Amino acid sequence: RESGVRQLERQLGAVARKVARRVAMGDTATIDDKVISSDEVRELLGRPKVHPERLAEHDEVGISTGMYYTPMGGDIMFVEASIRRGSSAPLKHDDGADVVRVGPISLILTGQLGDVMKESARAALTYATNNAALLGIPADRVASASEAHIHVPAGAIPKDGPSAGIAIALALVSEMSNRKVRRDVSMTGEITLRGRVLPIGGVKEKVLGAHRAGIKEVIIPKANEADLEDVPDEVREQLIFHPVETMREVLAIALVDQGRAAPIEVDELIGV
């Protein structure tokens, strides 16, 4: 989990020095098989200092699984949505959270979201409310909604970019329609007001992070199909990919009671 391998080199050096010290002191048990086990690595280097996200334990309403990448690598992230009903909420919360009005609904954004990600959240809410009937959202749920709260955990870490758009839209539709989201599906893609899914960057890193987290199926923009060629064969073979062009395709795949779209085999995607 770093840009390059400098820290990895340091840790390998630390392991080698500690093993050499044991050998010098007459303890050769560690190198009998010339292999150091994971338990011995923990003993030599201490507890892990990086704790990547793992697959959620249950399918839940209002929580979707997005994907992101940084120079340190890719990972999954959870997007949480909550809808409050009743009288209109104020445009400024006392806690300083970002609040904007989308029609009659106040949109609250927390989790240190950047400007581009905030715009994606607004687009996602507009799409969900404008297409409520088509998306299976009861009319009374939209009419009575006064506040939509989007939160992306790990609040101390700044987050930005458009690629969480479909994950935000999915969490909102799930919350407003009271339908669970599949926990084993992660996704990345920008959303438009009309529900189109646009291409994004970092597909390889995001897919590797999702695979490491235990994800089984990945939704990507159809325009990013060719980027799957960069994903190692051993990872591609263990995942099912769904290239999509519209948000309705995302919902058909990711909502538990919507049925599962037929998986697309990697060979069909990239012609290998």
PLM region spans:
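Extended amphipathic alpha-helical scaffolds
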Residues: A16, A20-E80
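Short, surface-exposed helix-loop/turn micro-motifs enriched in polar/charged residues
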Residues: G4-Q7, T30-D33, A139-V142, R183
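Alpha-helix C-capping/helix-to-loop hinge sites
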Residues: E2-S3, R22, G26, Q238
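Peripheral, non-AAA+ core regions of ATP-driven protein-machinery
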Residues: H51-L55, D59-E60, S64, G73-V272
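The conserved phosphate-sensing helix
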Residues: R1-R17, G73
